[in-house]
Amino acid sequence: MSITIFNRDLKEIYYEKQYKNGQLKFLYNTILGRMLLKLFISTRLFSKINAIFNNNKGSIKKIEPFINEYKIDMSEYEKKEYTSFDDFFTRKILEGKRSFSKEKSHLISPADSKLMVYEIDDDLKMNIKNSIYTVGELLNDEKLSREYKNGTCLIFRLTVDDYHRYCFIDDGSLKYRKVINGRLHTVGPISSKRYKVYSENNREYSVLKTRNFGKVIQIEVGALLVGKIKNHSIKVFKKGDEKGYFCFGGSTIVLLFKEKVIKMDEDILEYSKAGIETKIKMGEKIGETND
């Protein structure tokens, strides 16, 4: 299965194949696969075992084939001898390889990713990867979710070839952070036909008091074979500061804005309305304040 994506830089449509597509079809579309998923693969134990395999020296041999398969441009990253596959996966990008808009009114992307935009309707429901979710289900907090009625939801889907570190979108301070434990499932379209993907996943959200966008909620969501979301202990931050990173696997970031706070760039809006994600980079302008 492939996913249709708009490449904003090249102004063209391309098709992305899903990581380990055949294995996912087996897990979600067969009786034996679903039994394995329920009893073992989607458990914390399996995720921890997988993390151990990706953190040992033997996993280094996986790096070169991975780079070749996903055509990763390693000239963008720091040159170093990686100690494991996970060390490679959480690699840091070279300074200057991502441009951050300095305009206070500009909304930037927190990560290299594929972006979709959703309006939060009167019923506080949003369409996330072909399933319907309320903001309350995502946050596990109905009272907090009501603050975002008629607001905007931005979904940034990171795939295995993306840079898996992410940043703050504005100057501000952390009000509080909450961790929600769940069962791990993949974020792509195959699994979303079978499960409420996000409500089943481990996730962590931060309530941010930002200078230009008010009270923003940023949610990091883990996926199949991802056991860790690593957020730095930062109370006060600047636009573009690193917020954290994901360990191995495709993962997702969700941003929630209150009503009439932001105005998205037209191209992103148009493709989102057509059900097509937009490929963007961390720090790239994707919208602005709705003045």
UniProtKB/Swiss-Prot annotation:
Keywords: Cell membrane, Decarboxylase, Lipid biosynthesis, Lipid metabolism, Lyase, Membrane, Phospholipid biosynthesis, Phospholipid metabolism, Pyruvate, Zymogen. It is an enzyme of class 4 (lyase). The active site is at D112 (charge relay system), S251 (charge relay system), S251 (schiff-base intermediate with substrate). Pfam families: PS_Dcarbxylase. Binds 1 pyruvoyl group covalently per subunit. Pathway: Phospholipid metabolism; phosphatidylethanolamine biosynthesis; phosphatidylethanolamine from CDP-diacylglycerol: step 2/2. Transmembrane segments: none annotated. GO terms for cellular component: plasma membrane. Its EC number is 4.1.1.65. Its main location: membrane. The modification Pyruvic acid (Ser) is found at S251. GO terms for biological process: phosphatidylethanolamine biosynthetic process. HAMAP family: PS_decarb_PSD_B_type2. This is Phosphatidylserine decarboxylase proenzyme 2. It comes from Clostridium acetobutylicum (strain ATCC 824 / DSM 792 / JCM 1419 / IAM 19013 / LMG 5710 / NBRC 13948 / NRRL B-527 / VKM B-1787 / 2291 / W).
